[in-house]
UniProtKB/Swiss-Prot annotation:
Keyword Transferase: yes
Top-level taxon: Bacteria
EC primary class: transferase
Biological process according to GO: 'de novo' UMP biosynthetic process; pyrimidine nucleobase biosynthetic process
Protein name: Orotate phosphoribosyltransferase
Length: 230
């Protein structure tokens, strides 16, 4: 059932950040930085897939996603929800159920046998499709799915990520250039604010994380990762 109450966006962002800490989805390792799909190296990592294992948490997060979409996109803007392989698929199912909409999922590439399909499920030509991912860094993976939906005849004007890194100016430009409005609930700044408030990181760790968030590509380049985004 679609919820129609609208929490303050700042409250939802703070609550999601607290949830991610509570379920131990936030990880830090500056000595051996995490490698992201973009090729970047990062001292911090968020595992949003863990949200699925906590029913009360995931229900609240879906409430937040619905409120964000209804507030910022509208009530009758979508014909279908598309989940990106693989982490976006379960969240697409949950969101589609909340919004009483059909669901499809999109592979990163055609499967190479059978119908050689990249999109699974029924999507009418011209359907207005919302693409969902658990998180997005700079938008590259989301546009893999957006481009596939558009190539198959769908219309994509909106995407949603439960968590958005929010530290790359290039990301905002990518979505603007791609004519897609990105919706999201929380960013790294929200997670860091909770860490500071609840003293979840010591001062040295906070400083290292802030150094990354303030200049992520420079930090990545110094630590064995890419220093530019494609």
């Amino acid at each position: 059932m679609t919820q129609t109450s609208f929490s303050d966006p700042a409250v939802m962002a703070e609550l999601l950040a607290k949830m991610l800490w509570e379920i131990k989805a936030v990880h830090f390792n500056a000595a051996e930085p995490y490698k992201l799909a973009s090729g970047m190296r990062s001292p911090v990592y968020i595992d949003c897939r863990k949200l699925l294992s906590y029913p009360r948490v995931r229900s609240a997060v879906m409430d937040f996603a619905v409120a964000t979409l209804l507030r910022n996109a509208g009530f009758e803007q979508f014909d279908c929800i598309a989940g990106g392989e693989t982490a976006g698929i379960p969240f697409a199912a949950l969101l589609a159920d909340r919004l009483a909409l059909p669901m499809i999922y999109v592979r990163k590439q055609p499967k190479g046998h059978g119908r050689n399909a990249q999109i699974e499920g029924h999507m009418p030509d011209g359907a207005r499709v919302l693409v969902i991912e658990d998180l997005t860094t700079a938008g590259g993976s989301m546009f893999t799915f957006i481009d596939a939906v558009r190539a198959a005849g769908g219309v994509v004007d909106h995407g949603i990520a439960l968590f958005f890194y929010g530290i790359f100016p290039q990301a905002h430009q990518r979505f603007e250039n791609g004519n897609v409005k990105l919706h999201y609930i929380a960013t790294w700044r929200n997670v860091l604010a909770v860490a500071r408030d609840q003293k979840l990181f010591d001062d040295k760790t906070l400083s290292e994380v802030e150094s990354f968030l303030d200049a992520p590509l420079e930090w990545s380049g110094r630590n064995g990762g890419v220093s530019t985004l494609g």
